[in-house]
Amino acid sequence: ATYKVTLKTPSGDQTIECPDDTYILDAAEEAGLDLPYSCRAGACSSCAGKVEAGTVDQSDQSFLDDSQMDGGFVLTCVAYPTSDCTIATHKEEDLF
């Protein structure tokens, strides 16, 4: 399946198509968006965003704790969409 992922960035909202087997960060880059990242392995917070609607699978991540995930935070470098979703990007500073 392919889902519509709306990314709310500081420079405006962008909606991309993201297959359910593609990490959201990778799909965003393929669409020409410049999102923050560092490790690309789900082990830091550089790429953190916040899910505002919809669902994602970020079971590959190892950095966020349960309360952060329950709060909607997502590491876009290891997150697959599992529905159409809306994610606010550039949220690393909100984690701490």
UniProtKB/Swiss-Prot annotation:
Its cofactor is [2Fe-2S] cluster. [2Fe-2S] cluster binds at residues 39, 44, 47, 77. One of its GO terms (biological process) is electron transport chain. Binds 1 [2Fe-2S] cluster. Its main location: plastid. Signal peptide: none annotated. One of its GO terms (molecular function) is metal ion binding. Keywords: 2Fe-2S, Chloroplast, Electron transport, Iron, Iron-sulfur, Metal-binding, Plastid, Transport. Residues 3-93 form the 2Fe-2S ferredoxin-type domain. It is found in: Plastid, Chloroplast. One of its GO terms (cellular component) is chloroplast. Transmembrane segments: none annotated. NCBIfam families: fdx_plant. Ferredoxins are iron-sulfur proteins that transfer electrons in a wide variety of metabolic reactions. Belongs to the 2Fe2S plant-type ferredoxin family. This is Ferredoxin. It comes from Scenedesmus quadricauda.
